Regions:
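Glycine-rich phosphate/pyrophosphate-binding loop and the adjoining helix
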Residues: 9, 30, 140-189
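Conserved beta-strand segments of alpha/beta enzyme cores
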Residues: 34-36, 59, 149-152
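Helix-loop-strand module that forms the ligand-binding subsite of alpha/beta enzymes
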Residues: 61-144
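Cysteine-cluster motifs in flexible loop/terminal segments that predominantly coordinate metals
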Residues: 43-70
Length: 189
């Protein structure tokens, strides 16, 4: 059974990002994956303190609500990270999450816990899904150090409409199929 960890980086509990993440999670669950779902805006967690304690051990020493999720990421087969685009970037809690992934790499910048797929989900107000491609690629440049193999993006355009994702049948199918592919180990193949 594949284990998948999903992070929702949207403050809206019923918005486009969550709609897509829920479909990815459902596609994975329907194909026998175990899915752990975390909503960052509901969690109390600190940003990385750059204390470098994780260089001496394999864990972050900060004992907060993110700790359990980070432990699951270490053994997961796949990670899904979703965020709306605010001010041309991911939300602050998602950036803090990426910083807290620092213990996933060793002192030489190599992954400590093996390879796993990562799927990213974004919602944006702009209608061109390629507007932020360079930002997505820039963000993905850090993935190899974490042991993440980028399985691609799912982007919901026109997200100022809170029901954009729900009305886009093609996007919904793509999200469900992405979850299925993560569960079956065929994502990004």
């Amino acid at each position: 059974m594949k284990e998948i960890v999903v992070f929702n980086g949207s403050p809206r509990m019923d918005g486009n990002t969550v709609t897509i993440l829920d479909l990815v999670a459902q596609g994975a669950r329907d194909n026998r994956a175990k899915v752990s779902f975390y909503t960052l805006f509901k969690m109390k967690f600190m940003a990385c303190q750059s204390c470098f304690a994780c260089r001496m051990q394999e864990d972050c020493v900060i004992n907060d609500e993110l700790r359990e999720a980070l432990q699951k990421v270490k053994t997961a087969d796949a990670v899904v990270i979703g965020s709306p685009i605010y001010m041309m970037q991911m939300t602050g809690p998602v950036k803090n999450l990426y910083d807290r992934f620092f213990p996933l790499m060793d002192v030489d910048g190599r992954p400590r816990f093996g390879a796993k797929k990562v799927l990213t989900v974004y919602s944006q107000s702009i209608d061109d899904v390629h507007t932020y491609d360079s930002y997505y690629e820039y963000t993905a440049a850090m993935y190899p150090s974490f042991g993440f193999e980028w399985a691609g993006n799912i982007v919901c355009p026109n997200a100022n409409d809170p029901e954009s994702a729900d009305r886009d049948a093609e996007l919904k199918i793509r999200a469900y199929e992405a979850g299925k592919a993560l569960a079956l180990g065929t994502a990004g193949a």
